[in-house]
């Protein structure tokens, strides 16, 4: 929105045309879809039960163009970030808009590109970046899971998800 100088409605229409939005756009705008993905990634990372309801959600629906412009004036961009960490109180998960430096790897993300940053005591930061929205990436991910199941490859998260 910021880099293209488009209104929210124009960006929304473009994202819809590109196949980036869920059938119910509130799943995206409300951070719900991303929160579900965070819960699944957290279960893999920490070996815990997937608990979608434990993710604290705040979407991007309330972000205005003024908010975006003020952030830019300070050298930041507003990005929807999911953060998962194990604390002394247990697993904490949140999906919320955050200010990130516009020159940072997260600040440079555009369009349907996603990024996962994993931090470890011994390895520091590991960054995974790639296509994360649209028909192609979604179909690829689903087919990969289907093929793993067909091959009998155990998917650890399936035992942690109770529907």
Question: What do the PLM-derived regions correspond to, one by one?
Answer:
Residues 2, 9-108, 113-115:
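Substrate-binding/catalytic subdomain of NAD(P)-dependent oxidoreductase enzymes
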Residues 117-159:
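C-terminal catalytic subdomain
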Residues 161-163:
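Conserved small/polar residues in nucleotide/adenosyl-binding loops
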Residues 3-5, 123:
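Short acidic/polar capping segments at secondary-structure boundaries
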């Amino acid at each position: 929105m910021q880099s293209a100088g488009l209104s929210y409605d124009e960006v929304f229409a473009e994202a819809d045309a590109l196949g980036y939005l869920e059938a119910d756009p509130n799943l995206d705008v409300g951070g719900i879809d991303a929160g579900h993905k965070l819960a699944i990634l957290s279960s893999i990372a920490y070996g815990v039960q997937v608990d979608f309801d434990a993710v604290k959600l705040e979407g991007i629906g309330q972000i205005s163009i003024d908010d975006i412009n003020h952030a830019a004036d300070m050298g930041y961009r507003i990005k929807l970030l999911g953060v998962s960490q194990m604390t002394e109180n247990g697993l904490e998960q949140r999906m919320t808009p955050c200010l990130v430096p516009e020159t940072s790897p997260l600040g440079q993300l555009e369009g349907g590109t996603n990024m996962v940053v994993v931090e470890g005591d011994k390895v520091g930061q590991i960054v995974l970046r790639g296509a994360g929205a649209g028909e192609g990436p979604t179909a690829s991910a689903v087919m990969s899971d289907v093929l793993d199941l067909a091959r009998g490859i155990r998917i650890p998260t399936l035992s942690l998800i109770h529907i």
